[in-house]
Every structure is written in C-alpha cells, then in structure tokens.
Amino acid sequence: MPASLLRFLALAGTAVGLTTNHNHSPSCRVLPGDAAWPSSRDWAKLNKTLNGHLIATVPQASVCHKSPFGQYDAQACEELKSSWDISTITHVNAPGDVLSQNFQNYSCVPFTDPSQPCQLGNYPSYVVNVTGAADVQAALKFAQKHNVRIVIKNTGHDYLGKSTGKGALSLWMHNLKSTKFIKNYKAPYYKGPAAKLGAGVEGFEAYAMANSTGHRIVGGTCPTVGIVGGYTQGGGHSILSSSYGVAADNVLEWEVVTADGRHLVATPTRNSDLYWALSGGGGGTFAVVLSMTARLHRDGIVGGTLLGFNDSAVGNEVYWEAVAAFHALLPDFLDGGNSFTYSVGNNSLTAYGTMPGADRDAVDRLLRPFLDDLASRGITPVVQPRVSTNYYDHFFTYLGPAPYGNAAYFPFTNSRIIPRSLVTDPKSNAVVTDLFRNISQVPAFSPFYCDSFSVADKPHPANSLHPAWRTGMLLCAPAGSWDWDASPEEMAARDRYAAETLQPMMDAATPGGSVYLNEANHLYANWKESFYGDNYARLLRVKKKYDPDSVFYVKTGVGSEVWDVDATGRLCRA
C-alpha cells in the first residue's frame, strides 16, 4: 500500500472526520465519520484491485497549514500563492484539486492562516488514477456497494463544481493520454482523417498531435482544458467553429463505461442515443468517457490579426457606436469561416482574428469593412495582421505561449449565446450594446469576453447541442474575478450577484438566446431551459436508460433534480 494512502488512513479521523458518527439512510451518500463509511480495510482492498491506483486526497495547499498533514513549508506556500489562480497547470495536474475558488470553500487554500487546519471540504476523499476501463468498473462497483458518491475529474476547469464533491470517490481521467492518428476513418456518416484521443488529452496535446500529421482539430481557447471531457461533451466552442462547427459536431465515437460497468462504444449508428446525449448534453452525467474519436481537418495557412480600438480620440459615445457597428459587421465575416475572440471594456475593445486559408491580401480584404467603419468615426485602431503557416503556430501566436497558454480564470462566470438576428437589427443591436455597456461598468465583472461563430450550416451527425447555437453569433461572458483579500461573505455575495442580477440582465436583453452549460453560474435558477432547451426531455430519457439509479450526479446536469447537496456537503435524494 502506498505511503500516502497509509498516512491518509491514519489521519482519517482528523482530516476528513467532519461529520457525526451516525448511520445515514440510503437516500444519502455516506461521508467520512459515518458508521457506514467504508473501513480502512475496504479502501485497501480497493487499492489492491486497482493495482495501486488509489490516491488519498492531500490538498496542494497542505504545505500552507501546520495540521493535520504535517507538510507545512512556508517557502513552498509562497510559491503556491503566486500560481494559485492561474489557469495553467497548478490544479490541472493535482489529483483532487479544482480551479474554481468558490468550490475550494476556504477549506485548504494558501491564503488562510497557517494555524487553520487543512480540511478536504468539497474535495473528494479518494481519487482513482484511471488507467483504463477496468479501473472505472472497479471504482463504480465499489462506490455503489458502499453508497459512496462518484465524481469525474479531468483537468478541473469547472465553473459549476461538477468535478468535485465532499466525501466522493473521484475518477481522475487526466492520465489517459493516448493519441492515435487515423488516416482514413470510414463510416456511413464520415470518411476522412480522424484522431482517437484518450480522455486526459489536453488541448495543447491535441493541437500538437494534429499538427504533426498536417491537420488541425477543433478545441478550446485555453490549451490546458481537456478536449475529451466536459469541454466537448458540453458543446465546445472554438476559434475554428465558423469553419468546422463546435467540438461536439466533430465527434465520431465515444468510448465509455456505463454506471452498470458496461464498456461501450457510442456512434451515430451504434448506441446512437448515448452518442447523441454525450455530444452536447454535458459531461459527468451519462457515462464515464474513456476516449473520443473526432474529425481532423487538413491544415494550411491561417490569417490572423490583432485589432484594437478605444475612446481616447473620440469620446465614449462614439466608441460604443463603433462597438455596435463591429457587431453588425460580423455576420459576413463569420460566414466566410472566420472568427474573432475579443474583450469589451467600458472604453476599449481588443480582438484577435482567425481566418483559415487567408493569405495577406485576403486578410486585408476581410478586415477592410471594419477598418473603414472605424475610420469614418475618427478612430485609428491598432491593427497587426499576419499569416501563419499552420493552425498550431496561429493559435499560440495569439493564445500562447505554448504549450499552456496564458488564459486567466474568472470563477463567477455567466454566459449568453446571443442570436445573430439581434445584432443585424439596428433596434435590438442597440439593446445588446447597452447590455455590454452596463456590464462593462461593473468593476468586478469587466471586461466582457466574447467568442463569435457561425455554425448553422456545418455538417454534423444529430447531437444534443442547444438549438440556440445554430441561430447564435456570439457567446459572451463577464469576467467575474475573485479577491482573496475580501471576506468569504463578500465573495458569496458576488457569486449571488452574478446569478441573480447579471444573468437575468443578460437574458432579458437577448430574447431567443441561451446559456452555455459549461460556462455558467451554479446558482442560476433557470438552468434546465437555458442549458438544454427542448432537448431536456429526450436527454432525461437517455439518462434514465443508461444510469437508472442516478449514480452520476453533477450540479445542473441532466437528471440532477433528483439530488440535493445539503448544508454539510452531503449528497441526498431531493
């Protein structure tokens, strides 16, 4: 038995024994301290079954606290503080940690007093370092026998707390890193190059693999996000979406383990209902995904640009008129397979353009309508066009440095998929512009980040992506920041403000839109309609077919209404 597991079992009464020593009815999952909690012998037996792949959770920030793990190291703690909130590798490679500060719950973080005991809080009690289907099957069997909560974590980029849970046994998919290039995938629904990716493959690894074979693949703007996990299962927007659709549109196969331990492959023609649900219906809900096979696209040159402008020469009113015009000009640009990802503040806009296949002359032509409009308003923008020889080079030019990128992380995220029709109509475009303007003036939630796309006509097998994506043009989210100098009560109030004030404001200004289920607030009340729309009833039928006992629970996931997390963190039947 690994020393870490032995140490954890010895500390179980102090580190995680936070509940009273009582039995709880089967309607609730057990927690450490309950009489029904698995014994040390049970956990050791599971570890043997898993060939030593069971990890006792020891939070990274235990180095910042003097008890109970005995790892206090002031210098290591200072180093951890400097990288704690960065969306690169600090939490990605940690078995039990998650990135969202509001789900860290102040239980064991670098910013509290060293005398405060390091407690697991919302973190899982144990983690399975999954190496294949057999590990998942053994963990699911153990969890159901002992009534232990199951969670699934890949990289921990998770705004809604789906990948963690108090007292849980976590399936850590992060080290399933296999990649396979398929030169000519053949199926009734697709013939061409493809890639089979293990569940733990991150964006930067998928991009490198595709690049090495002369291809590109649809993935996210943060390169440390796991491309196979909740990203694609929830839809997956990309700077390539206007050319190839969202990530879910590109999936050819899902390899999974179901709640009852079956090892299945789901495609548009085999277990097609499960394929449909996994392709847009959200991660952690229907089955445990081991791998994904997705389309690759032939690589080539990619035009790019930095485009920025502000109100310094023309005043704020003219600046906002220019923002409205920028949006009105986007449809033609996007329909050519191009995109902008950009941020909008109260007095400046900064955009990065992606134009697949565009040489320098084409880049200049594509930018001309935007530049002419700005010139007509007396605005001189910053424009830095360039042409990259391939997509990998383009991506890391604008979203690098390679391999981990520099994406900031904002835990209080709301989002809105804004219909194209609202920005092409001058009257409703003015309402959308007012929305941008109002949110940009809320200090803790500015700037407004947006990705633009056109995916209405992209070929794809039937999937469960919210229909609003097909009629949408923008996905926008305010940047809700965390402040470790503020009190927990102040941060909780900020969280509620995002859900109860900002999101309704965004909804009201954009009728016909929806909320992206991967980038949303966990307190949002209207999640069922906004995340899933008319697909929900069918998704629920698939959920009940493949997980009739609701083994898999994630906040705001399909079927999650049958569960509730109480004030102590215990998961109970609603």
From Swiss-Prot:
Signal peptide interval: 1-17
Molecular functions per Gene Ontology: FAD binding; oxidoreductase activity
Cross-link (6-(S-cysteinyl)-8alpha-(pros-histidyl)-FAD (His-Cys)): H157-C222
Key words of the record: Disulfide bond, FAD, Flavoprotein, Glycoprotein, Oxidoreductase, Secreted, Signal
GO cellular component, one term: extracellular region
Mod. after translation: The FAD cofactor is bound via a bicovalent 6-S-cysteinyl, 8alpha-N1-histidyl FAD linkage.
Cofactor(s) listed: FAD
Glycosylated position list: N47, N105, N129, N211, N310, N346, N438
Localization in the cell: Secreted
Pfam family for this entry, one: BBE
Cofactor descriptive note: Binds 1 FAD per subunit in a bicovalent manner.
Domain FAD-binding PCMH-type: 120-299
SUPFAM superfamilies xref list: FAD-binding/transporter-associated domain-like
Chief subcellular location: secreted
Intrachain S-S bonds: C28-C572, C64-C77, C108-C118, C450-C476
Family that this chain belongs to: Belongs to the oxygen-dependent FAD-linked oxidoreductase family.
Function according to Swiss-Prot or TrEMBL: Probably oxidoreductase that, when reduced, rapidly reacts with molecular oxygen, a hallmark of flavoprotein oxidases. A large panel of alcohols, including carbohydrates, steroids and secondary alcohols were tested as potential substrates, but none has been identified so far.
Protein's recorded name: VAO-type flavoprotein oxidase VAO615
